[in-house]
Amino acid sequence: MSKFILLVCILLLTTNIVSAASKCGRHGDSCVSSSDCCPGTWCHTYANRCQVRITEEELMKQREKILGRKGKDY
């Protein structure tokens, strides 16, 4: 009987951990303001979804990595 109660307690604990709500909205989650989103993301004004903010520096770094050349072509 004690093994059964222990198993039920572990099952309930696991269920609570899995179903616990996150404190901040991840990419694509609904939001009203940027404070609803996790750090590094912001709330898109029209879509009301958390969105990753990509800076020009990050974009150019990835472009250089993909194309193998620096600078803008335009």
Curated annotation (Swiss-Prot):
<keyword id="KW-1015">Disulfide bond</keyword>
<feature type="disulfide bond">
    <location>
        <begin position="37"/>
        <end position="50"/>
    </location>
</feature>
<keyword id="KW-0044">Antibiotic</keyword>
<keyword id="KW-0872">Ion channel impairing toxin</keyword>
<feature type="signal peptide">
    <location>
        <begin position="1"/>
        <end position="20"/>
    </location>
</feature>
<feature type="disulfide bond">
    <location>
        <begin position="24"/>
        <end position="38"/>
    </location>
</feature>
<comment type="function">
    <text>The impact of this protein on the neuronal activity of the honeybee brain is not known. It does not affect apparent movement or hatching of blowfly larvae. However, when injected into fish, it induces a strong reversible paralytic effect. In addition, the presence of this small peptide in the hemolymph of adult drones together with its induction after bacterial infection suggests that this peptide exhibits antibacterial activity. This peptide may act by inhibiting ion channels.</text>
</comment>
<protein>
    <recommendedName>
        <fullName>Omega-conotoxin-like protein 1</fullName>
    </recommendedName>
</protein>
<keyword id="KW-0960">Knottin</keyword>
<dbReference type="GO" id="GO:0090729">
    <property type="term" value="F:toxin activity"/>
</dbReference>
<keyword id="KW-0800">Toxin</keyword>
<dbReference type="GO" id="GO:0042742">
    <property type="term" value="P:defense response to bacterium"/>
</dbReference>
<feature type="disulfide bond">
    <location>
        <begin position="31"/>
        <end position="43"/>
    </location>
</feature>
<keyword id="KW-0929">Antimicrobial</keyword>
<dbReference type="GO" id="GO:0099106">
    <property type="term" value="F:ion channel regulator activity"/>
</dbReference>
<keyword id="KW-0732">Signal</keyword>
